[in-house]
Amino acid sequence: MTLEEARKRVNELRDLIRYHNYRYYVLADPEISDAEYDRLLRELKELEERFPELKSPDSPTEQVGARPLEATFRPVRHPTRMYSLDNAFNFDELKAFEERIERALGREGPFAYTVEHKVDGLSVNLYYEDGVLVYGATRGDGEVGEEVTQNLLTIPTIPRRLKGVPERLEVRGEVYMPVEAFLRLNEELEERGERIFKNPRNAAAGSLRQKDPRITAKRGLRATFYALGLGLEEVEREGVATQFALLHWLKEKGFPVEHGYARAVGAEGVEAVYQDWLKKRRALPFEADGVVVKLDELALWRELGYTARAPRFAIAYKFPAEEKETRLLDVVFQVGRTGRVTPVGILEPVFLEGSEVSRVTLHNESYIEELDIRIGDWVLVHKAGGVIPEVLRVLKERRTGEERPIRWPETCPECGHRLLKEGKVHRCPNPLCPAKRFEAIRHFASRKAMDIQGLGEKLIERLLEKGLVKDVADLYRLRKEDLVGLERMGEKSAQNLLRQIEESKRRGLERLLYALGLPGVGEVLARNLAARFGNMDRLLEASLEELLEVEEVGELTARAILETLKDPAFRDLVRRLKEAGVEMEAKEKGGEALKGLTFVITGELSRPREEVKALLRRLGAKVTDSVSRKTSYLVVGENPGSKLEKARALGVPTLTEEELYRLLEARTGKKAEELV
């Protein structure tokens, strides 16, 4: 490559990277994946190293992020600069990082490092004076960010006041959206036909930039902190000499600190931690796109200093990009339990994150228009939140002209009824649509709803075909003679199913509300509604104002719930369920026997896991999905997963199922059978 060719390519890359910086940092709406962005930055960096005369202080390789050009929040200048991190993509590059440290310090390693998960969120800076939070701001370009104090304060774990800290203090961290909250939010947005978020990082950024803090508060944001700006030297003088100790100091001061950090010696030690965490990546409750490796000894940080863009004492060791190219072969349309029609893309099968992917949701009309996706397109796919296959972007440069636009059906693909269009959402209004009935019963019987074991998809189809059930209330009218004789259904199987159906009557209001599929009502909201109203009769008479008082309920959701509660067909369904003996009262709270305790469950229990979780919550405990230092007990069933290993590493006490029930008996004076 000649100098002129290099100059032309460097200018192209700089313009392209600046554009994508603006999309990512300012609009929180990136058009390319992190892996593609890293490739562009890497190409630019290599060209600048090969042709030093092309280096420039305004190059993206010398800068962090993008200045908030059209900020909707007040710009604030950080007292000390917030840097980005350089990246390593393989062990050789990690080793090269250690060798640079050795040369700069004039001595051989190995050195001690602190290794932390690189939480994929939005970097923030909290500024305190005399222990009082003055403001919180986004990173922006590293020198100027946007003040987002009110929105940050909707995260309950962020301290407003501190004791025993330097007079002026900056605390740095990451605001993120847990995967579970991200999936729930996208489900709600999709249901309303609104634009969904591409990943948890975008969802966190978009939520933190809301003008109304009440919206931010309902998004389930979390924060983790890991560094100091102003005030670090004073803290060092107090005896905090390492990054590992600094993380402990932050925890002692009340800041949430991501629990999975570790010490390692030398590049080989870091590699061992990296490989271990890479395997466990999808067990994390948040998205992590790598690990952050920092020299542990803080005194060495000052010796090494910074480049224009990043510290020399730290590096981001990125996980491999889990994205694949494939073709969209066709689009089919599915009808859900609410009648909403969802397009599903049929892909040339690809292997992604341990499983074959051949279908991908295309969500709604807004999503298809935004992507400009067509049948025959080459697409880049990944798993959103590490769970759901999703199209990341369309590879338009590979179009041949033979691609076809996606046409929405005018009639229901299941029953032929003419579809209604509500904004960008297409719905089948036919109450007798077989697809709506099937999905409603399948959801009602699912594990987190009424948990009717043995009522699988094939059996639901047969019950509908034979006219034995038309809706969920009909399940409670089934008799043994109705079931015996159905394909693969003998007398014993029929008895077992009827026993499961009978037991489901006692699940309580919380599970019933989730099972009935009220609009926008997931597990958390069902729990909140049950706690607020106590029984179905009171909920049926709720006003809009009363619904808006419920935690996690916004105005759109409240109006949709109210419309359903007033619907005569819904009220008739509730009446028939009540006549069948389905309990419609919230489960008795059970006092505060376990208040202040946090439980996590792993492995198979003798009782349904959701039943045990509900019992623990009724007794005042908190039940989470991941083990941390805040976990009081890990309940261990048969065939436990990686949570057991993590609990042992953190020193978290474990209980067998039998030991758990003994603990409950000691705390409540009742046996487990009496409590369930």
Swiss-Prot record:
Its cofactor is Mg(2+); Mn(2+). GO terms for biological process: DNA repair; DNA replication. Zn(2+) binds at residues 412, 415, 428, 433. GO terms for cellular component: cytosol. It catalyses: NAD(+) + (deoxyribonucleotide)n-3'-hydroxyl + 5'-phospho-(deoxyribonucleotide)m = (deoxyribonucleotide)n+m + AMP + beta-nicotinamide D-nucleotide. InterPro entries: BRCT_dom (IPR001357), BRCT_dom_sf (IPR036420), DisA/LigA_HHH (IPR041663), DNA_ligase (IPR001679), DNA_ligase_AS (IPR018239), DNA_ligase_CS (IPR033136), DNAligase_adenylation (IPR013839), DNAligase_N (IPR013840). Belongs to the NAD-dependent DNA ligase family. LigA subfamily. This is DNA ligase. The gene is ligA.
